């Protein structure tokens, strides 16, 4: 698991989402709009895929609302998803052929520039970052 550095964000957005199966599509649409407005279209597909995986995991493993933060730093775009699911720190798995679940964090690990998990007494935060190559704010 790679570790983050914490540069000061240029801007931040936050989204509180209910425990609702439609939340994943709401978060994807929100991130798509934010990245388009910031002229970061070069990372939309990757970020949309990764946020779908992380928010889906939060929905499946928690029964309460989830909070999503989106930050643009000088070097990357970071997404953090907080949920209220207690338990073991999630790790990438190697699912068996034909398994429909268990690939999400492996996809996050493969497609992000950095990612990680922070445990809290009330749940956890899964974060990832993607660097837009050749784009300056």
Per-segment meaning from a language model:
Residues 1-14, 59-137:
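Conserved beta-strand-loop-beta-strand hairpin that lines the nucleotide-binding pocket
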Residues 14-28:
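STAS-typified acidic loop motif
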Residues 19, 35, 39-42, 58, ...:
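Short coil/turn residues that cap or connect secondary-structure elements
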Residues 24-52:
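Conserved short strand/loop->alpha-helix "switch" segment adjacent to the catalytic nucleotide/phosphoryl-transfer site
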Residues 27, 31, 54, 79-81, ...:
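Hydrophobic packing within well-folded, soluble alpha/beta domains
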